[in-house]
Amino acid sequence: MRGPLSTLHGDQHVPITCHIRYVIDPFQRDAFEAYAKAWLTIIPACGGDLVGYWLPHEGTNDVAHALISFPSLAAYETYRARLRTDPAGAANFALAQQQRFILREERTFLTPVTAS
């Protein structure tokens, strides 16, 4: 992958976490939940360390979150390549496109703060 991620660190062994912020249709919360549950097995099968998905509970009713960690940028790139060819992943992406319960998706890549 090229672009902003490739310039974060010269060290390819820095752990990264992908934070995904979803703006969802609040009237299709159950459909988004089914979509999120499918990722619980797809993401680990493709090499991501899924921290979890979070649905709105109190307050804002149209924002959901996901966190996926990787030991390095190279591991993230390997994960993306696997995900592109995964039939279950393709089916889940197609479901989201057909049902249109995701209105917007934002990705932020984070690195941990360490003592050293």
Feature locations, PLM:
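Short, Lys/Arg-enriched N-terminal segments with co-localized hydrophobic residues
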Residues: 2-13
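Active-site-flanking beta-strand signature of metal-NTP-handling nucleotidyl enzymes
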Residues: 16-22, 65
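An amphipathic, aromatic/His-enriched active-site/gating alpha helix that lines ligand/cofactor pockets
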Residues: 31-51, 69-106
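Short acidic/glycine-enriched loop/turn segments that link adjacent beta-strands
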Residues: 59-62
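Short, low-order "capping/linker" segments at domain edges
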Residues: 106-116
